[in-house]
Amino acid sequence: MQYSIEVNNQVEIFDLNKVAKQAAGAVMLRVKNTVVLATVARDDVQVEEDFLPLTVQYIEKAYAAGRIPGGYVKRETKPGDFETLTARIIDRSLRPLFPKGYAYPTQIVVMVLSADPEVDLQVVGLNAASVALYLSDIPVNRPVCGVRVGYIDDKFVINPSNSELKSSALDLYVAGTKDELLMIEMRSIAQQSSQIIPIIAIDPMMDPSLNDSITQKQDMNEFSEDRIVEAIDFAGKAILRASNAYEEAFKEHKKEDAILELKPEIENENIAIYIDKFYKNDVKNAINQMAKSERASELGKIAKQIASDEVAQKEGWEEGVISNVLGKYKKKIVREQIINEGVRADGRALDEVRPISIETNVLPNAHGSCLFTRGQTQALVVATLGTDGDAQMYDILTEKTALIEKFMFNYNFPGFSVGEASPLKAPGRRELGHGNLAKRALAPSIDINSPYTIRLVSEILESNGSSSMASVCGGALALRAAGVDTQKLVAGVAMGLIFEGDKHAVLTDIMGLEDHDGDMDFKVAGSSDGITALQMDIKLGGISLEVLKEALYQAKRGREHILNLMHQADSKIEVNEDVLPKLELFSVDPSKIVDIIGQAGKTIKEIIERFEVSIDLDREKGEVKIAGGAKKNVDAAKDYIISITSKENSRGFGKKPHGHDRRDKDRQKPTFNIGDEFDGVVKSVVDFGAFIELKDGVDGLLHISKIKTPLNVGDRLKVCVSEQKGNKISLSLVE
């Protein structure tokens, strides 16, 4: 059975009961030439643990774009970063829909079978998964819809195409039901524009247009709190339209809810009553233990004590059941203290940020580093600068060619940061998600045309909530410590929310306890002028626009406080120039690039080896980028390249001068005999010796082992040829 729904700037064609009919729910969704299959499967046996055992997998098939997987193994292997992040979006959007106490292992699989380059796979993937879940026998009684909002030509656009999104200042992804918002991800996208600046004419007869200077201006495109609320409201109306359309089309096809046993919120009410009567103060004292490991230890002691009590022995209360009830009672106390007394576990006010300390360039040999500590959360963020050759290449199903990423952010969360003895493993979904959020927050502040490839690594050394936002703050200062001239400092703060009946409380800079026992995790990052990135996950049924606005403005006050401290630290940064890579960027005639490369790359390899530098070339623009550890090596390599591109006999690929052939070119190569003597001039001095100009612009290397006294550029000395291999000439001093 097929349904066609035209909504939110796209036509969605759903196929029901056509494929995967043994799954609890399945739907095939087509938008233009994109086809996605979403399935839902459920086990019949509950897990004993107190959590929702939901697994979401998003898989892109290479054949969807008419490709065969690259590499030695010609099949899809582990998911890429985009697949992992998309699976997280779907998971976070659908998880709040499941009823409390649902403990049946459930798997949602979304497979991309055909990919249209212009269709947003994250929007289509979530909508397909939502309908499949809604149609299943799992007691989920409302569909979720995901939409993306762009900001193009000063107006909001719903579900822009992939090409349209590239010209957008905003990338906002919102998921929700017709009544509530469930998940939000947002980033601002920096844009460059040309700016004409009039200058004073030197020659009054000059063409007036030549009296103008054209410069590039970059706008971070931060969004104010009001504009964000406006954009989310715009998305909410689109979600309402789609959700109503889904319900109307599919409610008749929804399977009857399976008869499932839901776990009670409190496994044994008598234990809860007993704890409240005899151990309430002990639980409150345990809550005040800030470290997760210490708090767990104290609660464990209380559980053991209760289990040894005569009442527990008589009633047959098992320690495991007592621990579960105690954990839920602890959550109740935390929430009651916040709602009724305005008191947080660490004694802070609801809008108070924990104490902050900042140290920069704590690692002497790293390009830039920052140790950012906020309460019991500590991030060591390290910046490394590289060249174009260090950039990350990756494939996207909707792009024909590999994309190049020159700004990377890696987030690492070792077990010792929370006092656990756990093995160090490859980064999981959480690490990838936190790193991606920090990257999105900082990216607009970095020059789009930066000559460097930049890698930030955040090592979480302590964690008690908000480690991703500590990574943003530390990352902004690590960039400055590495000499990267970012446009503005960016700070981040994690917000929380507690709902009890008709009361609610918004919390600034939440710690781990408040994250675990609260109803919302809302991370907001930005500069003093607005928001560059945010992420919201909701644990209850949803959140209203009014409460969201309150949280945004409270986050702004917290962010401004943090930025003030960061500006103080920034003013004290001393960049360690000695460890930074040296970079030279210059242009030559594009036709001369081939002379720099040489036959089969021989010349450029010799330059790289001789001067110990890395070289990146732009054939079309004629741009040459040289990077190295020593400035004199970089300068010497630049001089050498300029010399070989300025020779009259150098010529571009395919430009054969009239009357010359390959034999003429061979005859033009300088040839010397061993022992030939010359009055040479020192052209450049490098770590391993000096380059001496002999005749006709030909250079030779006088190795440092043969130099007895210091040499300077321009010195004249008598040398002789000791060896020649191709164009490489080795020299010795003539006594």
Swiss-Prot record:
UniProt keyword list: Cytoplasm, Magnesium, Metal-binding, Nucleotidyltransferase, RNA-binding, Transferase
Domain S1 motif: 675-734
Binding site for Mg(2+): 515, 521
Domain KH residue range list: 581-641
Required co-factors: Mg(2+)
Molecular-function annotations in GO: 3'-5'-RNA exonuclease activity; magnesium ion binding; polyribonucleotide nucleotidyltransferase activity; RNA binding
GO annotation, biological process: mRNA catabolic process; RNA processing
Listed EC numbers: 2.7.7.8
InterPro entries hit by this protein: ExoRNase_PH_dom1, ExoRNase_PH_dom2, ExoRNase_PH_dom2_sf, KH_dom, KH_dom_type_1, KH_dom_type_1_sf, NA-bd_OB-fold, PNPase
Coiled-coil region: none
Location of this chain's protein in the cell: Cytoplasm
Region (Disordered): 649-671
Gene Ontology, cellular component aspect: cytosol
Parts of the chain that traverse the membrane: none
Keyword match Cytoplasm: yes
Reaction(s) catalysed by this chain's protein: RNA(n+1) + phosphate = RNA(n) + a ribonucleoside 5'-diphosphate
Family: Belongs to the polyribonucleotide nucleotidyltransferase family.
Function: Involved in mRNA degradation. Catalyzes the phosphorolysis of single-stranded polyribonucleotides processively in the 3'- to 5'-direction.
Protein name (database record): Polyribonucleotide nucleotidyltransferase
